[in-house]
């Protein structure tokens, strides 16, 4: 989140949160961005959409947070930037996950396909159609192989997490 805020600055923004889950990323950004900012959040899970909507209400942000059930390829609107924590675990690695992850997460929120980038690529294919302005970027949280794989196909900058692993990517259009 701090990477996005440092990059964006103190301007108002209308942004999208793709794969919003509980809404933590989009709502945290709304709390830090100036008044007048807004977020369109989407997720394929109706339970996630309901949870993120309740969280927005609890934080007093429901007037600037709009969540709906849609996939990354169905994102529409015009956004200053997009943030996403898509499913990024390669399918072959799902069996090795800890029980506390598997038992409490919707499997669709975890399985990123063969290389962990299926949903990220769907979003990146859609992004040029919905990004506006001069700073047309998508911010992604991925597994540590994701940024390097993305850089083969996209103009991409990677960033390290608190453990020093490359887990964040900004893809510019």
Give the role of each language-model region.
Residues 88-119:
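Mobile active-site "lid"/loop adjacent to the S-adenosyl-L-methionine
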Residues 88, 172-173:
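C-terminal beta-strand of the catalytic ATP-binding
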Residues 114-171:
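Conserved Class I SAM-dependent methyltransferase catalytic core
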Residues 34, 105, 131-134:
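Helix-to-beta-strand junctions that scaffold the AdoMet/dcAdoMet cofactor pocket
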Residues 46, 100, 105, 141-144:
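Acidic-residue sensor for enzyme active/binding pockets
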Residues 1-96:
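Conserved SAM/SAH cofactor-binding pocket of Class I
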Residues 29, 101, 123-127:
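Class I S-adenosylmethionine-dependent transferase superfamily signal
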């Amino acid at each position: 989140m701090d990477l996005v805020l440092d990059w964006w600055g103190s301007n108002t923004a209308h942004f999208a949160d793709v794969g919003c889950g509980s809404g933590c990323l989009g709502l945290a950004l709304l709390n830090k961005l100036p008044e007048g900012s807004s977020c369109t959040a989407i997720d394929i899970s109706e339970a996630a959409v309901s949870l993120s909507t309740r969280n927005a209400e609890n934080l007093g942000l429901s007037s600037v947070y709009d969540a709906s059930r849609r996939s990354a390829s169905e994102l529409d609107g015009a956004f200053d930037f997009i943030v996403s924590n898509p499913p990024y675990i390669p399918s072959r690695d799902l069996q090795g996950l800890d029980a506390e992850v598997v038992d409490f997460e919707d499997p669709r929120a975890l399985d990123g396909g063969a290389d962990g980038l299926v949903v990220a690529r769907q979003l990146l294919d859609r992004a040029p159609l919905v990004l506006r302005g001069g700073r047309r970027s998508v911010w992604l949280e991925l597994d540590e192989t994701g940024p390097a794989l993305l850089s083969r196909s996209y103009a991409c900058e990677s960033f390290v997490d608190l453990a020093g692993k490359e887990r964040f990517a900004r893809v510019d259009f």
